[in-house]
UniProtKB/Swiss-Prot annotation:
Organism listed in the record: Human cytomegalovirus (strain AD169)
The name this protein goes by in its record: Uncharacterized protein HHRF4
Keywords: Host membrane, Membrane, Transmembrane, Transmembrane helix
Family listed: Belongs to the HHV-5 US29 protein family.
Subcellular location, record wording: Host membrane
Residues spanning the signal sequence: none
Membrane topology: Multi-pass membrane protein
């Protein structure tokens, strides 16, 4: 049972840490692994160009950290930095043009999905534009996070996550169309896509004039400011739609990458089952489970499972288990192993009490060398030289039925003591050898008299 628990815990740990993180499919917006890049597209006011303490690099690979020139720097180095900054901005304006357009239309969608964003370079921060207040104070930058993705209908468009790296309402998006000409509304800065390749920027392969703002709860939540920034506000009461279910094609794209992981998990489960289930259950399943159903059970769960197996195979129910109590011995066992209170001592006085009960009647008949039953005579350990117990041939009943009268030859056989260290007693009552102690002579005479009385023969030697 402990081995089975160990295998169970090992398998649970294997599946949890091997497959849990790969099998779980989250129904949330894809996480954008963005690489922040700041691109300057508008020059600072002339009054601030000479002593611009907030000078930033053109392409910062992490974020827009300011690199301030030291006050003690050489004037020539400052002029070169200013020239490079102006030259870089002029290069951006001549290549990409002004990033200003007007909003020509919007469309709200509750069943929007996109995919294949990872087939392009890492996501970048889009068109960060430094803005200034009327008193020549920097307002910050307008930044967008997103990428060129495949949207519904097989077209590629730019998708912006309005919530940054956080989760978003699945399926809700607002499409905003920008235009460069025939603008009745004021022009605003729109998110222009710049892809970063080895330090250089390339225009987006998606249409920059059609942008999807993904993750909104209602169309009124998005506000495009006059500077082209994106503002967020609360949705009106009752206008918040429920998030739609994930689209079928989007789920297929998410599950496509899990096929190999699921196959590995299935192989791990198969190996675990091969370790737990014996091969006999695979080769002969009917015989194996039938044998399991017929085997005795100890626990309640094991008994319930085997009862179900018996019902499946049409076997009779298992016998009822007796309540725990005192074990009752059978009559045969009680006769073979009597309790300690029924043991009887030898019928004559002895100087040593036996340490163990006498053997049964059948055992004494099987181990004796003569046909007459034997009796163990226990004497003092001071009498014998090597053996502490002397065995003499005599007749004892111990509850056996009395035997019929025997002939004189049988009496002569009873009077002969053949055990070692036991003197030979003649009919005259003399001890030839061995016994020097007086008690032993009296014991021998008593045994001979008892033997003669039992056989019914009268001693006529006197």
């Amino acid at each position: 049972m402990r081995c089975f628990r160990w295998w169970l815990y090992s398998g649970w740990w294997w599946l949890t840490f091997g497959c849990a993180r790969t099998v779980t499919v989250g129904f949330v917006a894809p996480t954008v692994r963005a690489q922040s890049t700041v691109v300057r597209s508008e020059p600072a006011p002339p009054s601030e160009t000479r002593r611009d303490n907030n000078d930033t690099s053109y392409f910062s690979s992490t974020s827009f950290h300011s690199s301030v020139s030291p006050a003690t720097s050489v004037d020539r180095q400052f002029r070169r930095t200013t020239y490079d900054r102006w030259d870089g901005r002029r290069w951006l304006r001549t290549r990409y043009g002004n990033a200003s357009a007007c909003v020509t239309g919007t469309q709200w969608s509750t069943n929007f999905f996109f995919s294949q964003c990872e087939h392009y370079p890492s996501f970048v921060k889009l068109n960060g534009v430094q803005r200034w207040t009327p008193v020549r104070r920097p307002m910050g930058e307008v930044a967008y996070y997103g990428g060129c993705c495949m949207v519904g209908g097989g077209n590629r468009a730019y998708v912006i996550l309005v919530s940054g790296y956080g989760t978003a309402s699945y399926g809700n998006a607002l499409r905003v169309n920008f235009g460069r000409g025939n603008c009745t509304a004021p022009k605003r800065t729109y998110p222009r896509r710049l892809e970063l390749h080895d330090g250089r920027t390339d225009p987006s392969r998606c249409d920059p004039y059609q942008v999807y703002f993904y993750g909104l709860q209602c169309p009124e939540q998005l506000v495009i400011t006059a500077h082209g920034g994106v503002g967020m506000r609360r949705c009106p009461t009752g206008s918040r739609p429920t998030p739609s279910r994930p689209h079928r094609h989007d789920l297929e794209n998410e599950l496509h990458g899990l096929c190999v992981d699921l196959l590995v998990c299935v192989l791990l489960l198969a190996l675990l089952l091969l370790e737990l289930v014996p091969m006999e259950a695979v080769r002969h399943p009917l015989l194996f489970w039938r044998r399991v159903a017929l085997s005795p059970s100890t626990s309640k769960v094991d008994r319930a499972v085997k009862l179900c197996l018996r019902r499946m195979f049409g076997l009779p129910p298992p016998p009822s288990v007796a309540p725990p109590g005192e074990k009752k011995e059978l009559p045969a066992q009680a006769a073979l192993s009597p309790p300690l209170t029924t043991w009887s001592l030898p019928p004559f006085p002895s100087t040593r009490i036996p340490d163990s009960p006498p053997p049964p009647y059948q055992l004494r008949h099987a181990t004796s060398l003569v046909t007459v039953p034997t009796l163990l005579l226990y004497t003092s350990s001071d009498i014998g030289d090597t053996a502490s117990e002397t065995t003499c041939v005599a007749h004892a009943t111990y509850g056996e039925p009395p035997e019929p009268a025997r002939s004189t030859a049988t009496v002569q056989e009873c009077t002969v003591l053949t055990a070692p260290n036991c003197g030979i007693v003649n009919n005259d009552g003399a001890v030839s050898e061995g016994q020097d102690h007086g008690d032993a002579v009296h014991h021998s005479l008593d045994v001979v008299s008892q033997c003669a009385a039992d056989t019914g023969v009268v001693d006529t030697s006197e």
